[in-house]
């Protein structure tokens, strides 16, 4: 993933907490609106040269280019705070906080598959921590996940 334009960065995996319950309680049409609003909110919070994609369901991935660990942690504090703001859809106020796992590039790798696996491990740990949390990958997580 490194190039002349990107010397460091972070790969983020994001997952909505309790999205199945949103679909079950409010219906899939409302769930689809939550996904759309979440993507819009995320796009507004990240830089234009960061790459945001939806993986499917309620999962997103973001590649943040040329950002250090301190800066990404500050960004994720803001993201988790903003994602606690409920969405107003029709007559409903719906919370859709995110859990986020991330891995630093090139500290823990440079290939997509390797970084994806590590960000996913960190996401799993963030989900264990509870709603609206984030975790950075470190090698000890990999040992415990195996």
Segments from the language model and where they lie:
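Generic alpha-helical segment signature
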Residues: 72, 93-94
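Conserved long alpha-helical elements within nucleotide-processing catalytic cores of c-di-GMP signaling
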Residues: 2-10, 17-47, 53-57, 61-65, ...
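Core hydrophobic beta-sheet residues of small sensory/regulatory alpha/beta domains
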Residues: 11-13, 136
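A general marker of short, structured functional hotspots
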Residues: 15, 22, 42, 83, ...
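A structural signal for short, well-ordered beta-strand segments
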Residues: 11, 60, 98-102
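Hydrophobic beta-strand core residues of beta-sandwich domains
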Residues: 29, 46, 87-88, 96
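Flexible interhelical turns and helix-capping residues at alpha-helix boundaries
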Residues: 2-5, 68, 87, 91, ...
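Cyclic nucleotide signaling catalytic output domains
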Residues: 52, 78, 82, 88, ...
